[in-house]
Amino acid sequence: MQNKIVKIGNIDVANDKPFVLFGGMNVLESRDMAMQVCEAYVKVTEKLGVPYVFKASFDKANRSSIHSYRGPGMEEGLKIFQELKDTFGVKIITDVHEIYQCQPVADVVDIIQLPAFLARQTDLVEAMAKTGAVINVKKPQFLSPSQMGNIVEKIEECGNDKIILCDRGTNFGYDNLIVDMLGFSVMKKASKGSPVIFDVTHSLQCRDPFGAASSGRRAQVTELARSGLAVGIAGLFLEAHPNPNQAKCDGPSALPLSALEGFVSQMKAIDDLVKSFPELDTSI
Protein backbone atom coordinates (compact mmCIF):
# COMPACT_ATOMS: atom_id res chain seq x y z
CA MET A 1 0.00 0.00 0.00
CA GLN A 2 1.34 3.40 -1.00
CA ASN A 3 1.58 5.89 1.86
CA LYS A 4 0.01 9.23 0.97
CA ILE A 5 1.88 12.41 1.86
CA VAL A 6 -0.02 15.44 3.13
CA LYS A 7 2.05 18.62 2.93
CA ILE A 8 1.70 21.39 5.51
CA GLY A 9 4.07 24.02 4.24
CA ASN A 10 7.48 22.35 4.39
CA ILE A 11 6.24 19.53 6.66
CA ASP A 12 5.50 16.12 5.14
CA VAL A 13 2.90 14.13 7.07
CA ALA A 14 2.98 10.44 6.15
CA ASN A 15 3.02 7.10 7.93
CA ASP A 16 6.56 6.32 6.76
CA LYS A 17 8.02 9.80 7.38
CA PRO A 18 9.44 11.12 10.69
CA PHE A 19 6.60 11.68 13.14
CA VAL A 20 5.04 15.13 13.38
CA LEU A 21 4.15 16.51 16.81
CA PHE A 22 0.74 18.18 16.84
CA GLY A 23 1.13 19.75 20.25
CA GLY A 24 -0.20 22.58 22.32
CA MET A 25 -2.98 23.04 24.82
CA ASN A 26 -6.56 21.83 24.98
CA VAL A 27 -8.23 25.23 24.80
CA LEU A 28 -6.96 28.78 24.53
CA GLU A 29 -7.06 30.08 28.10
CA SER A 30 -5.34 33.40 27.43
CA ARG A 31 -3.09 35.05 24.89
CA ASP A 32 -0.13 34.99 27.28
CA MET A 33 -0.47 31.30 28.10
CA ALA A 34 -0.76 30.42 24.41
CA MET A 35 2.49 32.30 23.77
CA GLN A 36 4.19 30.53 26.68
CA VAL A 37 3.07 27.06 25.62
CA CYS A 38 3.85 27.56 21.94
CA GLU A 39 7.32 28.92 22.72
CA ALA A 40 8.08 25.87 24.87
CA TYR A 41 7.04 23.47 22.11
CA VAL A 42 9.01 25.39 19.48
CA LYS A 43 12.20 25.33 21.57
CA VAL A 44 11.93 21.60 22.26
CA THR A 45 11.02 20.52 18.73
CA GLU A 46 13.67 22.72 17.11
CA LYS A 47 16.31 21.36 19.50
CA LEU A 48 15.33 17.75 18.77
CA GLY A 49 14.59 18.18 15.06
CA VAL A 50 10.94 17.15 15.26
CA PRO A 51 8.41 18.65 12.79
CA TYR A 52 5.85 20.65 14.76
CA VAL A 53 2.28 21.99 14.47
CA PHE A 54 0.64 24.02 17.28
CA LYS A 55 -2.82 22.89 18.41
CA ALA A 56 -5.53 24.46 20.54
CA SER A 57 -9.28 25.07 20.42
CA PHE A 58 -10.90 28.50 20.39
CA ASP A 59 -14.23 26.98 21.49
CA LYS A 60 -14.85 23.69 23.27
CA ALA A 61 -18.42 23.41 22.05
CA ASN A 62 -18.95 19.89 23.39
CA ARG A 63 -18.24 20.40 27.10
CA SER A 64 -20.26 18.14 29.37
CA SER A 65 -21.48 20.95 31.60
CA ILE A 66 -23.10 24.24 30.65
CA HIS A 67 -20.92 25.82 33.36
CA SER A 68 -17.58 24.64 31.95
CA TYR A 69 -15.13 27.03 30.29
CA ARG A 70 -15.36 26.92 26.49
CA GLY A 71 -12.71 29.34 25.27
CA PRO A 72 -12.37 32.87 23.91
CA GLY A 73 -14.49 32.25 20.81
CA MET A 74 -13.63 32.32 17.13
CA GLU A 75 -12.86 36.02 16.64
CA GLU A 76 -10.47 36.35 19.58
CA GLY A 77 -9.06 32.86 19.00
CA LEU A 78 -8.11 33.61 15.41
CA LYS A 79 -6.30 36.77 16.53
CA ILE A 80 -4.23 34.69 18.95
CA PHE A 81 -3.49 32.09 16.27
CA GLN A 82 -2.33 34.78 13.86
CA GLU A 83 -0.02 36.25 16.49
CA LEU A 84 1.46 32.81 17.15
CA LYS A 85 2.10 32.34 13.43
CA ASP A 86 3.67 35.78 13.12
CA THR A 87 5.83 35.36 16.24
CA PHE A 88 7.00 31.76 15.96
CA GLY A 89 6.39 30.84 12.32
CA VAL A 90 4.39 27.78 13.36
CA LYS A 91 1.69 25.90 11.49
CA ILE A 92 -1.60 25.65 13.39
CA ILE A 93 -4.44 23.15 13.72
CA THR A 94 -7.80 23.89 15.34
CA ASP A 95 -11.30 22.44 15.31
CA VAL A 96 -14.54 23.79 13.90
CA HIS A 97 -18.06 22.91 15.00
CA GLU A 98 -20.32 24.96 12.75
CA ILE A 99 -20.52 25.40 8.98
CA TYR A 100 -20.11 29.18 9.20
CA GLN A 101 -16.76 28.75 10.97
CA CYS A 102 -15.09 26.71 8.24
CA GLN A 103 -13.87 29.34 5.78
CA PRO A 104 -12.86 32.06 8.27
CA VAL A 105 -10.87 29.53 10.28
CA ALA A 106 -9.29 27.98 7.17
CA ASP A 107 -8.17 31.47 6.12
CA VAL A 108 -5.97 31.72 9.23
CA VAL A 109 -4.89 28.23 10.30
CA ASP A 110 -3.25 25.46 8.29
CA ILE A 111 -5.35 22.45 9.30
CA ILE A 112 -9.00 22.39 10.29
CA GLN A 113 -10.15 19.55 12.49
CA LEU A 114 -13.41 17.61 12.31
CA PRO A 115 -14.38 16.75 15.91
CA ALA A 116 -15.06 13.13 16.78
CA PHE A 117 -18.65 13.77 17.87
CA LEU A 118 -19.39 15.50 14.54
CA ALA A 119 -17.46 13.28 12.14
CA ARG A 120 -20.57 11.88 10.41
CA GLN A 121 -22.32 15.25 9.95
CA THR A 122 -22.28 15.42 6.15
CA ASP A 123 -23.05 19.13 5.77
CA LEU A 124 -20.17 20.06 8.07
CA VAL A 125 -17.82 17.59 6.36
CA GLU A 126 -18.67 19.05 2.95
CA ALA A 127 -18.21 22.65 4.13
CA MET A 128 -14.81 21.80 5.56
CA ALA A 129 -13.72 19.93 2.45
CA LYS A 130 -14.71 22.79 0.16
CA THR A 131 -12.33 25.20 1.92
CA GLY A 132 -9.46 23.27 0.34
CA ALA A 133 -7.66 23.15 3.68
CA VAL A 134 -5.94 20.12 5.13
CA ILE A 135 -8.49 18.27 7.27
CA ASN A 136 -7.78 16.23 10.38
CA VAL A 137 -10.59 13.77 11.09
CA LYS A 138 -10.94 12.58 14.67
CA LYS A 139 -12.23 9.01 14.84
CA PRO A 140 -15.46 8.95 16.85
CA GLN A 141 -15.26 6.89 20.02
CA PHE A 142 -18.27 4.92 18.81
CA LEU A 143 -16.97 4.13 15.31
CA SER A 144 -14.81 1.23 14.16
CA PRO A 145 -11.51 2.08 12.42
CA SER A 146 -12.75 0.61 9.12
CA GLN A 147 -15.71 3.01 9.05
CA MET A 148 -13.32 5.95 8.70
CA GLY A 149 -13.13 5.08 5.02
CA ASN A 150 -16.67 6.44 4.55
CA ILE A 151 -15.71 9.82 6.01
CA VAL A 152 -12.64 9.97 3.80
CA GLU A 153 -14.84 9.25 0.78
CA LYS A 154 -17.16 12.16 1.65
CA ILE A 155 -14.23 14.56 1.77
CA GLU A 156 -12.67 13.26 -1.43
CA GLU A 157 -16.00 13.48 -3.28
CA CYS A 158 -15.85 17.23 -2.58
CA GLY A 159 -12.49 17.44 -4.34
CA ASN A 160 -10.22 17.49 -1.29
CA ASP A 161 -7.66 14.73 -0.78
CA LYS A 162 -5.62 16.46 1.95
CA ILE A 163 -6.78 14.22 4.77
CA ILE A 164 -5.25 13.13 8.07
CA LEU A 165 -6.96 10.59 10.34
CA CYS A 166 -6.64 10.65 14.13
CA ASP A 167 -7.45 7.97 16.70
CA ARG A 168 -8.51 9.20 20.14
CA GLY A 169 -9.68 5.96 21.70
CA THR A 170 -12.78 3.77 21.53
CA ASN A 171 -15.59 3.34 24.03
CA PHE A 172 -15.05 0.34 26.30
CA GLY A 173 -18.30 -0.01 28.17
CA TYR A 174 -19.48 3.10 29.98
CA ASP A 175 -17.15 6.00 30.81
CA ASN A 176 -13.90 4.42 29.66
CA LEU A 177 -11.72 4.49 26.56
CA ILE A 178 -9.20 2.01 25.21
CA VAL A 179 -6.89 2.20 22.19
CA ASP A 180 -6.80 -0.72 19.77
CA MET A 181 -3.28 -0.70 18.34
CA LEU A 182 -4.44 -2.83 15.41
CA GLY A 183 -6.84 -0.03 14.47
CA PHE A 184 -4.08 2.20 13.11
CA SER A 185 -3.28 -0.18 10.26
CA VAL A 186 -7.01 -0.71 9.64
CA MET A 187 -7.46 3.05 9.20
CA LYS A 188 -4.47 3.19 6.88
CA LYS A 189 -6.01 0.49 4.72
CA ALA A 190 -9.55 1.93 4.84
CA SER A 191 -8.25 5.32 3.67
CA LYS A 192 -5.87 3.88 1.05
CA GLY A 193 -2.76 5.11 2.83
CA SER A 194 -3.78 8.41 4.44
CA PRO A 195 -1.58 9.62 7.31
CA VAL A 196 -2.79 8.36 10.68
CA ILE A 197 -1.93 10.14 13.93
CA PHE A 198 -2.63 9.32 17.57
CA ASP A 199 -4.29 11.67 20.07
CA VAL A 200 -2.65 10.25 23.16
CA THR A 201 -4.01 12.91 25.53
CA HIS A 202 -7.71 12.40 24.90
CA SER A 203 -7.29 8.63 24.85
CA LEU A 204 -6.37 8.94 28.53
CA GLN A 205 -9.73 10.42 29.49
CA CYS A 206 -12.01 8.57 31.86
CA ARG A 207 -15.32 9.89 33.02
CA ASP A 208 -16.85 10.29 36.43
CA PRO A 209 -20.34 8.87 35.72
CA PHE A 210 -21.89 11.48 38.02
CA GLY A 211 -19.49 14.35 37.37
CA ALA A 212 -19.46 17.31 35.00
CA ALA A 213 -15.90 16.89 33.73
CA SER A 214 -13.58 14.14 32.59
CA SER A 215 -10.87 12.68 34.75
CA GLY A 216 -7.67 11.33 33.23
CA ARG A 217 -4.69 9.01 33.49
CA ARG A 218 -1.74 11.33 32.97
CA ALA A 219 0.68 8.84 34.55
CA GLN A 220 0.20 6.55 31.55
CA VAL A 221 0.80 9.10 28.79
CA THR A 222 4.33 7.90 28.06
CA GLU A 223 3.54 4.20 27.78
CA LEU A 224 0.52 4.85 25.57
CA ALA A 225 2.45 7.20 23.26
CA ARG A 226 5.31 4.71 22.99
CA SER A 227 2.86 1.99 22.00
CA GLY A 228 1.28 4.12 19.29
CA LEU A 229 4.56 5.12 17.69
CA ALA A 230 5.75 1.52 17.77
CA VAL A 231 3.04 0.68 15.22
CA GLY A 232 4.46 3.14 12.69
CA ILE A 233 2.26 6.23 12.38
CA ALA A 234 2.52 9.75 11.02
CA GLY A 235 2.34 11.73 14.24
CA LEU A 236 1.30 12.32 17.83
CA PHE A 237 -1.37 14.69 19.07
CA LEU A 238 -0.43 15.96 22.54
CA GLU A 239 -1.57 18.50 25.10
CA ALA A 240 0.71 20.02 27.73
CA HIS A 241 0.06 22.70 30.33
CA PRO A 242 2.23 24.80 32.67
CA ASN A 243 0.05 23.64 35.58
CA PRO A 244 -2.23 20.76 34.56
CA ASN A 245 -4.06 20.79 37.90
CA GLN A 246 -5.21 24.34 37.13
CA ALA A 247 -6.08 23.74 33.46
CA LYS A 248 -9.56 24.84 32.41
CA CYS A 249 -10.14 21.68 30.38
CA ASP A 250 -8.77 18.10 30.55
CA GLY A 251 -5.96 18.89 32.97
CA PRO A 252 -5.90 15.31 34.37
CA SER A 253 -4.80 14.04 30.94
CA ALA A 254 -2.33 16.80 30.09
CA LEU A 255 1.45 16.47 30.24
CA PRO A 256 3.23 18.97 32.51
CA LEU A 257 5.04 21.43 30.26
CA SER A 258 8.19 20.83 32.30
CA ALA A 259 8.25 17.19 31.10
CA LEU A 260 7.92 18.05 27.41
CA GLU A 261 11.56 17.75 26.33
CA GLY A 262 12.07 14.37 27.97
CA PHE A 263 8.82 13.08 26.49
CA VAL A 264 9.54 14.23 22.93
CA SER A 265 13.10 12.94 23.11
CA GLN A 266 11.85 9.45 23.96
CA MET A 267 9.20 9.53 21.24
CA LYS A 268 11.71 10.59 18.59
CA ALA A 269 14.03 7.73 19.54
CA ILE A 270 11.22 5.19 19.23
CA ASP A 271 9.96 6.62 15.93
CA ASP A 272 13.46 6.67 14.43
CA LEU A 273 14.04 3.06 15.44
CA VAL A 274 10.71 1.73 14.19
CA LYS A 275 11.02 3.47 10.83
CA SER A 276 14.56 2.19 10.33
CA PHE A 277 13.23 -1.36 9.98
CA PRO A 278 12.39 -2.73 6.53
CA GLU A 279 8.76 -3.70 6.05
CA LEU A 280 8.32 -7.46 6.27
CA ASP A 281 6.22 -9.37 3.76
CA THR A 282 4.08 -11.77 5.82
CA SER A 283 1.82 -12.83 2.96
CA ILE A 284 1.64 -16.46 1.86
Curated annotation (Swiss-Prot):
Q: Which GO terms describe its molecular function?
A: 3-deoxy-8-phosphooctulonate synthase activity
Q: Which cellular component, as a GO term, is one annotated location?
A: cytosol
What reaction gets catalysed by this protein? D-arabinose 5-phosphate + phosphoenolpyruvate + H2O = 3-deoxy-alpha-D-manno-2-octulosonate-8-phosphate + phosphate
Pathway involvement?
A: Carbohydrate biosynthesis; 3-deoxy-D-manno-octulosonate biosynthesis; 3-deoxy-D-manno-octulosonate from D-ribulose 5-phosphate: step 2/3; Bacterial outer membrane biogenesis; lipopolysaccharide biosynthesis
Task: Cite the InterPro entries for this sequence.
Answer: Aldolase_TIM, DAHP1/KDSA, KDO8P_synthase
Which subcellular locations apply to this protein?
A: Cytoplasm
Q: Name one GO biological process term.
A: keto-3-deoxy-D-manno-octulosonic acid biosynthetic process
Keywords, comma-separated and alphabetical: Cytoplasm, Lipopolysaccharide biosynthesis, Transferase
Superkingdom of the organism of origin: Bacteria
Say which enzyme class the record assigns: transferase
Query: What is this enzyme's EC?
Result: 2.5.1.55
Major location category of this protein: cytoplasm
| Family statement | Belongs to the KdsA family.
PANTHER family noted in UniProt: PHOSPHO-2-DEHYDRO-3-DEOXYHEPTONATE ALDOLASE
Q: Spell out the protein name for this chain.
A: 2-dehydro-3-deoxyphosphooctonate aldolase
